Amino acid sequence: MTVFFNGRLLTTPTVASEVYDQGMLDQQPATGNTLAVIGVSTGGVPTTPLWLYSISQAREVLKGGELLRAVEMAFAPSNETAGPQAIVAVRVNVATQSQRTLLDGSAGNNIVVKSSDYGVANNNIRIKIEAGTTTGKRVSVQQGTTVYIGDNLARDYFYVYYNGAADSAAIAVNDSQVILYSTTSAVETTVATIALSQYPTIQDVVNRINAETGFYATVQGATGTLSSIATLDNKAKTDCTDKSSPYTGGQTITGNCQVIVDWINSTAELLIDAERVASVTQGPANLAWAYLSGGTDGPAVTISDYTDCLTELETEDVQWIVPLSGDSTVWAAVSTHCAFMSTVGKRERRAF
């Protein structure tokens, strides 16, 4: 009796075998069979499960190293078998970000920028700040041939003036409050202390100011829905009295620091992240091309680094774990992890 087996027609009794690798595939979305690989790479957030869905994405995220090579091989196990739908990669080497602190015109700390990725390769990211083409600042961020440019970065939040019965009035702004003052016969009174936590948008703040007799505020541009908390350029107590039309002698409250932070953290720029320093009064000063520094690929990997990665995988829906290590202590930790997850953790796992 003849039979077809593994693409061959067998006509005589014989022993035949084939490699069956279908078990490594996600057969359907409802069937969990996902591989997690732990190893060293030159890109990616450390000690964090990274869900990857293609070789191209893996190369973009992991950059290089044994972890990338293993993921590439897992996505393309053979020319005859399609790869899995997803692979979870965990970078075991505790790399650090590169960073730089931007200063304001008074040499005070203004914005802290850090590389979005981790590793020594990010020390070649550089940033430049110059005057905007028509207003504000022009910020350029570059790594290799990739350049992102944000131009005319300036932001007016709201305009306020006083036209009441008092002799004069003033406004002060900090990260958590807007304070209104009035002065009559040389006696100053605090009219209102507006807690930004209670008025979290620019429109909320403007409405609250307008509730005080003699004070008038208007939102500038499309900023009404933006957050007011720790985003306003701080301002010391400043006179905002204007009792003559067209009432242009008041004060404009700005966010020239925050607008740069928002641009850096948006999808318009993908190399660095930014954080505004507390109590800033203005945006950053101009800066010639300057590099970020401090990024490393981390110290030598230890057993605790692997156990940290295994801990992070406890909440992930994976069924197979491959640690790229020949260390017996690492494999002992993986064995303990699989035993725990397959019983107490109620997520059956195997390692190889």
What are these regions (language model features)?
Residues 1-352:
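Surface-exposed assembly/interface segments
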